[in-house]
Amino acid sequence: MSLATREATHSLALSEPLPLTRHPVAVYLNGLATGSRPTMKQALDTIASMLSGGECDALTLDWAKLRYPHTAAVQAELVARYESATAQKMMCALRRVLTEARKLQLVDAEELVLALELPKIKSTQRLRGRALSGAEIGALMSVCASDETVQGTRDAALVAILRGAGLRRAEVVKLELADFEPETGALEVRRGKGGKDRTVYLPQGAITFVEAWLEVRGRTPGALLCPIRRGGHLEMRHMTPQAVLLILQKRAERAGVESFSPHDFRRTFCSDLLDAGVDIVTVQKLAGHASPVTTAKYDRRGEEAKRKAVQNLGF
């Protein structure tokens, strides 16, 4: 759906390209973590397309020309089109871009205040994602173990790390060999979400799979997990987050496991630790969440956990 007339489309397009150092979108994206940039760029491309009838993207729209009628229309359309969490994230990107436009002196402060004076988007409280069952995780590991190629060994280590440490895929692909301590199972996560470092620990079973991969990979410094070319040739460079998604999709299909996202391993990690009686603050620290409130949102134990909990009440 377009929010623009032909006349409005023309008026919102940049008359000439801006240097990237003066472009509010470029400045905003440059301040984000590398893994967050594609998602937020896509969000801004979508908003630019809505406002211009498909004629502009994030870099060709003149964001400094946006006023309250534009931002209000965008928010209304996003709320109608997406889940509340997605709409909130996209509006956050819009707000940040307009704020950068103000800092770059492209828009008047008063106009910015008016443009951003919008009602809060109400959360639908609908849970996203799911937790994987033990049987599903076992099936994924079995498929990897039955693959006698180096890809099978690497993918088993990948699943073991995602399941055993609950890392984000952007974090797992940045791991270096030096970040893994075999004796304790410690993994040093450097510059995770929010630029924070943390230490997590793999259970013994997961350590075994990582060690098996290192027997194939060798001890050359560099990426802990790396791409593999045809013929089983290892490339000593980091994998991409997209590669992790594709690997998991392929393994899930072969294992007969229902569709899931890489992030569902984090939900499973948090849910299983909470189910095992680990306090929520410890789970929060392991997951790298800024608040235990965020950790609680990852709990996918469902009704069975509540049923078990009340059995502790005495009568």
Question: Each predicted region: which residue ranges?
Answer:
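Conserved catalytic core of the tyrosine transesterase superfamily
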Residues: 1-315
